[in-house]
Amino acid sequence: MIVEFRTYTLQPGSVAQAEERFAAGLANRTKVSPLGAFWHTEVGPLNQIIHVWPYDSLEARTKARSTHVEGWPPAIREFIVDQTSQIFVPAPFSPKFEPAALGGLYEIRTYTYKPGAIAGVIETWSKAIDARTNLSPLAFAGSSELGDLNIWCHIWAYKDAQARFEIREKARRDGIWPPRGGTPGQLLKQVNMLVVPAAFSPLH
């Protein structure tokens, strides 16, 4: 299993229109392979849309993307400022991208580690993840395979911003999270953003 995250930076004021055009062609596209999630940024880099596509393999991705689909890709090129694509491999404890109502606000956190550190991260997290997911749902966790390397991505769902604050505070206060252990000095950089699901997002 691989998961592709496609992030498009759009011109200011164009996100709503881009989402409408994306939705118009989506029914035909998802006959080829399912959409995992679709968000737009609320806090962090603005005017971005993030669409997530799970595939069984790189070969399955190539086949799906080479299949002709009526009305696809959506007619949003006029809005696009920048496009990036990154492919992740889910951690053993990561949920699958399946339709679910997990919350109205999602936090995407990406951590850059020193080369070779990700295996240790997975081991450390696996010991603490159940206690953390009792507080709020984990939507995804995985490491980068193509694109920027040594990236650890984890996505958490919350009812709203206030719930996020309260849950994260409780996790820290009760010693539930962040996970303890691991090798010090491996984490190099942390970035987060808050995103909101589009009306048609399977994960919402």
Task: Give the residues covered by each predicted segment.
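Short acidic-aromatic low-complexity motifs
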Residues: 12-14, 114-117
